[in-house]
Amino acid sequence: MDVLLANPRGFCAGVDRAIEIVKRAIETLGAPIYVRHEVVHNRFVVDDLKQRGAIFVEELDEVPDDATVIFSAHGVSQAVRVEAERRGLKVFDATCPLVTKVHFEVARHCRAGRDVVLIGHAGHPEVEGTMGQWSRERGPGQIYLVEDIEQVATLQVRQPENLAYTTQTTLSVDDTMGIIEALRVRYPAMQGPKHDDICYATQNRQDAVRDLARQCDLVLVVGSPNSSNSNRLSELARRDGVESYLIDNASEIDPAWIVGKQHIGLTAGASAPQVLVDGVLARLRELGANGVSELAGEPESMVFALPKELRLRLVS
């Protein structure tokens, strides 16, 4: 039995930046530092930051006056920003720059008076933040959430001739393209972004897991259950006809999964650290894996800048 590692896998530039912002804020300003929502969707990462002095909250009313708060990588609505400013909270924004790009698109369409269709998953914090970029004060348009092709058939927009779409950044590329095509059939005048809103890291990891699926009879995806991009990776492998499981760490591996398998693929979502992948590799060796190789994959060199106040110190 051998193991084939996907490449790229694990942390993307937006996740790296968000985690580093929390670490450096704690080091520079001292604990506690409040973080609105899990900074990234990974239990191991969140637990580590808690031990360092981060306090995770869901709403700003849980943050004391005069405290420092960090917005998670998923972004926040304009209402949250306004509330933080009204209360005089010190804010570090860890929103992924690629999510911020989507926010700017929605705000631009809103100012132009367009209706906007957001393709995404209801309840996901990124979607809530993006939906929250629309406001009546910014323009007369409306924003609508579409989760799947079936909803396109029943969608009723106010301005079919003045309509644009945007997407959550962590969706399945194939699912999203199908929804966009259905929207274009129904609303031929619909505008779209100049470049795909699904981020480069999501695309690269989805391409890599499909490469794994072609060569393996089992694919394990390291990631937490609430990680959208990690769930999509496991779904894609299963869609390609390969048994696949999403696991938080090595302890969740069921030895029965390995029985009779010759080639095991291993990847990790964009919010899962390499240390968890290493733990899974160690467990697979205990279960009989005797060789590990790595796909070539798509090189990634993207780095996102930290806030100016946090650029001077290094955190291990």
From Swiss-Prot:
This is 4-hydroxy-3-methylbut-2-enyl diphosphate reductase. NCBIfam families: ispH_lytB (TIGR00216), PRK01045.1-2 (NF002188), PRK01045.1-4 (NF002190). One of its GO terms (molecular function) is metal ion binding. (2E)-4-hydroxy-3-methylbut-2-enyl diphosphate binds at H41, H74, H124, T169, S227, S228, N229, S271. [4Fe-4S] cluster binds at C12, C96, C199. Isopentenyl diphosphate binds at H41, H74, H124, S227, S228, N229, S271. Catalyzes the conversion of 1-hydroxy-2-methyl-2-(E)-butenyl 4-diphosphate (HMBPP) into a mixture of isopentenyl diphosphate (IPP) and dimethylallyl diphosphate (DMAPP). Acts in the terminal step of the DOXP/MEP pathway for isoprenoid precursor biosynthesis. The keyword Metal-binding applies.
